Amino acid sequence: MEEAYRQARKRGEQGRRRAISQSEYPYLTDLDSLVAQLPLGQRENVGLRDIPLEMVVGTVTKGRQSAFSCNFMPLLPFGTEFARKWSNLYDIQVTEGYRDPIIVTEFMHRFYVQEGNKRVSVLKFLDAPTVSAKVTRLYPGTWDSVESRLYGEFCAFWRVCPLYEIEFSREGSYETLAKMLGQNLIEKWPQKKVDYLRHTFLLFKRAYLCAGGDHLDITPADAMLVYLNVYNQDRLLDTPTDIVVNRLCKIWRELVIAGKNDEDKVDLVEAPSVDEEKAPAKSTSGVLNFFMGKTVYSAANPLRIAFIHEFPCATSSWDSLHDQGRQYLDEHFGGIVRTEAFEDCHDPDVFYAAVETAVKHGANVIFSTSHRLMEYTLRAAVEYPRVRFLNCSIGLPHQSVRSYFGKMYEAKFLLGALAASMADNHRIGYHASVFASGALSEINAFAIGASLLDPRAQVILTWGDVPAGGLAEAMCREGVSVMTGADMSKSLEDPTAYGLHRLVDGKVTGIAMPVWNWGRYYELIVRSLLHGTWDETSDDNQVRAVNYWYGMSSGVIDIRYAPGLPYQTRKLVQLLRNGIVEGSINPFGGELHSQNGVVQIEGFPPLPSTQIVEMNWLADNVVGTIPQLDDEPKVPAL
């Protein structure tokens, strides 16, 4: 008894000194002082609950603050009445256990003790995981901060799945977790599902701490979401801890990125290096090796690249264009680069089989050409760390997979201006089939371009797939004479259902279309590999995701006019295009207005690129709404 108290007091002194050395408060926090200047909401009697002891962080009042260190260990000398009572409670706990619950107030996902401070101290000394408590929840008075919104999401989660242990630091994570488990935040979860999540989380947390996760700036629940995005959760309970630890080590950089602020997660590479722009084009011998720097490839030792397409190239124009880019590499680099393609890999098993085959064939680089393949690509990249993986997407913060996409908003800005110059009634249609990263910047750039030519222009926004031949019907229904569809036809059977069109006498006629030059894009990326500048793009000491985001100035994006377009119109659009390429025109510079008000005032510089990628608003001349994201696909294990 005496020895236990002396050890506990020693821990208390250590905790107190450590807090002082780190300029932190060395005693227990009291809730009364914490909320004295804060607006508070209602109280709710939650009832009798088992709560995690690690979340018990202070007292309700100041009364016993100085008797405990900030780690809840005792500070008063042995021989005091306090020490005697603490020791008696210790004896009861180790011989028969406590019968009565403590009384606590919950505030912002932390607990403050009203009755039972010494019992909490004893249990923490014994490393007990939980304590029985009568809980009263105190709600904040406002919900306008990130912390309060996160707590609101936790409360919604807790009502359907009463687990205190699950704590996230990113908004939206509770909903993501619910979707992964086939649940939602509205209907109460079956008890079996609650128990399953509790056991799964505790198993994962144990492995996470064994791997050194307590040194990261994320919670164990944050880390579990990252893990489940890569590895299947169905067998997690049956997976030995050492295997989970090994997997965590493989995705460690993904965990590090998860702990960064959004603005620090991604490096946007917006232009190729000078070497990539001006590199020698083609060689079939070792002459080019002189120029290769760190990375040496030749016809005898080629750079092998695999392309994995979501659908067959014969039926998908998107995949067909990417495959044309692949073929361009074979021709352009004359044997120094050799490629192979895998089509119709939207099924995860087919995708992973394609990766395995490509690796067996000696692939150094693997491109997956759809953003919907990113999760499969991430899983494969973790399994094959020596292979470089890239996915055609933007704004996704994965260190193991580089992303690449084009500044399509630049082309849409030009198409918007062109549309306004030809619309009869100030109404212009915009049909978007997919809500993905970058989609809103394209819509807004189109709307801003239209407003430059016609301040009264309205952009009528619709979403979803359009059946073959359905564009004209959609235009009539919306009362518009000019409309832009998808960047390209989803099916080669309907080649007119994309780009900017005009409805004349019931017939759809093309005006212009955006153009992807994937051959040029792949050439620039491959040059970075051939010249050894790939690794110079990112700093190994700063773990960040790398996203290539090239535009018109790099030659990867352009527009193509339909025959017969008036030369005056072409001249106007060409002037705007030159401004985009030279950098003197940016659709997101200066005064900007959204449907909800002013985004920025006149004279402001263009929005930062990260804000353009992550745009979450619609321009004030857009008539439409932002849809809710569909459920993300689950990624089966390899």
Show the residue positions of the predicted features:
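Extracytoplasmic "Venus flytrap"
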Residues: 305-324, 329, 342-348, 436-440
